[in-house]
């Protein structure tokens, strides 16, 4: 076992107040591409940039194209949790982990068994009619063609925070609470460039910050442990 992984294992073994803050890199080992990696969504060629196609304006003005892109690129219904998701769920069952705070919208943490999951950017698994509020599962979106419609005729919109939309204030407040109270804070699979989510790290008051990310990022945060590598492979050793 690598010395840095051994150090992280010592921190997590000794703690019963771990909080995990994760991004797209947590799900890449489940086959879901990271937006910003070399082979991620932002480096693929589309008619419009992905951040345009995933914006509230595009949803309003090019609704059918929005859903075509969303179905093709944002839904990964066959994806399964990897070792990182499973380890976090295991820690929660053991009473060690207090919360998972995620920027991901894929629902894999819940699929792995995690209960206290704060989804900063929403979830593809939840969808609501914009007219009557009726709930729909992700299958309704996946199986639809064109613009998905409710039985009342309204548009079914995913519970996903699009560009230009604001984050849920209640979810943000709960995330701040958990981070502020944390003994060990693990940041995994995120380049910390998406705000306001990335700004949550400033609320951590402890001295046991660990960063697991391909390409690093921990030194600038003053992390106690920085591990450059795939998070699933790392967490499988903890």
Go through each PLM region and give its residues.
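Conserved catalytic core of sirtuin-type NAD+-dependent deacylases
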Residues: 1-238
């Amino acid at each position: 076992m690598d010395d840095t992984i051994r150090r992280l294992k010592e921190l997590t073994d000794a703690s019963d107040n771990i909080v995990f803050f994760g991004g797209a890199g947590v799900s890449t080992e489940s086959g879901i591409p990271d937006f910003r990696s070399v082979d991620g969504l932002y480096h693929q060629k589309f008619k419009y940039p992905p951040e345009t196609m995933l914006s509230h304006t595009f949803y309003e003005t090019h609704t059918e194209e929005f859903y075509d892109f969303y179905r093709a690129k944002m839904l990964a219904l066959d994806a399964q949790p990897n070792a990182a998701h499973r380890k976090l769920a295991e820690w929660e069952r053991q009473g060690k982990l207090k919360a998972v705070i995620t920027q991901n919208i894929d629902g894999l943490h819940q699929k792995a068994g995690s209960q206290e999951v704060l989804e900063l950017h929403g979830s593809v698994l939840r969808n609501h009619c914009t007219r009557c509020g009726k709930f729909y599962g992700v299958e309704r979106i996946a199986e639809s063609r064109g613009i998905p419609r409710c039985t009342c005729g309204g548009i079914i919109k995913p519970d996903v925070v699009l560009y230009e939309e604001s984050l849920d204030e209640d979810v943000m407040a709960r995330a701040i609470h958990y981070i502020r109270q944390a003994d060990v804070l693990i940041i995994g699979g995120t380049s910390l460039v998406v705000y306001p989510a990335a700004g949550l790290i400033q609320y951590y008051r402890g001295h046991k910050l660990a960063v697991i990310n391909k390409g690093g990022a921990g030194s600038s945060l003053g992390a106690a442990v920085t591990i450059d590598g795939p998070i699933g492979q790392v967490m499988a050793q903890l």
